[in-house]
Amino acid sequence: MAAAAVSRTLLPVAGRRLWGFTRRLPLRAAAAQPLYFGGDRLRSTQAAPQVVLNVPETQVTCLENGLRVASENSGISTCTVGLWIDAGSRYENEKNNGTAHFLEHMAFKGTKKRSQLDLELEIENMGAHLNAYTSREQTVYYAKAFSKDLPRAVEILADIIQNSTLGEAEIERERGVILREMQEVETNLQEVVFDYLHATAYQNTALGRTILGPTENIKSISRKDLVDYITTHYKGPRIVLAAAGGVCHNELLELAKFHFGDSLCAHKGDVPALPPCKFTGSEIRVRDDKMPLAHLAVAIEAVGWTHPDTICLMVANTLIGNWDRSFGGGMNLSSKLAQLTCHGNLCHSFQSFNTSYTDTGLWGLYMVCEQATVADMLHAVQKEWMRLCTAVSESEVARAKNLLKTNMLLQLDGSTPICEDIGRQMLCYNRRIPIPELEARIDAVDAEMVREVCTKYIYGKSPAIAALGPIERLPDFNQICSNMRWTRD
């Protein structure tokens, strides 16, 4: 890991420059000859290959029960602290699908120490924020607070995941809340299309199920289901206590030992295995000619977090880029697909994505088109994918690498995104990858590597397709698959 840097300031001596080039000072003497200082004398000040980086160190400690404590101290007056748990909808089956998300909702409904009102008042009085979310492979509970309130924030998080009452009345009341949330999700067409995409790409597997679960499960999940899920999955080796901002690692470590050291024991017997999820090239079409626009997602199988091809696929994803009609630039856009789309008025917007899981992933593109341009837009996408496999240039790759590094650094703006990055990376890699290492891995990608990796994962592969809306003109699946091997002019 990158060591914490010591900031050094070098004060210049009057009349001298600290760069290794010549300084020219004109004299007002009669000869008016220039006098030179410097030359090779300051060559020793040139930068060394290894530079001192002002990057806070991510400190990691593992407790005896397997729980990992990770933190980054930036010295500010606020902090974010949270619990990242290796448990999501992928660990569910058909009968209890939706339990992880239901449990997230129940976390703030009261504990053995605090009623729901007491919990809300305590958070409000601290000026803090308490939140949670569930994904297909992770469940997260986190709090944002003043640095001085770190002990209280950790105690509240520990109370939530270990002492929730899970009262029957609260469970029944929360069913209606989740059902209304499901109705809201169904109005978000992008969410709907991505659920369809997972359903067709990972048919009859855990990744093919939704995070919220089907309606019948939401109506039938019991307190026993929630308790069983906690007992099975909320174990020390599968939990990371992460913090960022103004936090002292030793203080956080002592808090973790006090609140979690004796309670979150390791698994007794076998650790629940992550169910394998096989990718299937296939499609889901939901035609509705009453809708004004067609929503379409097309993806190929990618790789998991730790696969060596992950970085190269991220660069390829950046090469495709994003676009919508509000963008300026026209034919001067860096993305070739954006240029084609803008020039031909092929769609309202498109967004490339690279979704990674533990052992698999989805790499593709989501687009919103008018009925008349669906086929042309899909053809343009596949043509651009084939170009990635055969003709991408070094200048394009260099530009994409710079953009990828910039976007990654801009996302780490504030204690909350940094804390999320720490927690996620600890679960995925069992370490926090230092930024210089990540930049070096991105810099190692070249055009030849992009062509090889894209050929490996894109060329000749059957994609997964989810389409919704007026999609009458969408080509049939066999034609789409054939265009993954060659393109017509």
Swiss-Prot record:
Q: Keywords for this entry?
A: Hydrolase, Metal-binding, Metalloprotease, Mitochondrion, Protease, Transit peptide, Zinc
- Per the UniProt record, the source organism is Rattus norvegicus (Rat)
Q: How is the enzymatic or functional activity of this protein modulated?
A: Binding to PMPCA is required for catalytic activity.
* Note accompanying the cofactor annotation: Binds 1 zinc ion per subunit.
The entry's protein name is: Mitochondrial-processing peptidase subunit beta
Q: Where is the active site?
A: 104
This protein's major location comes to mitochondrion
On whether Cell wall biogenesis/degradation is a keyword of this UniProt record, the answer is no
Question: Which cofactors does the annotated protein need, by name?
Answer: Zn(2+)
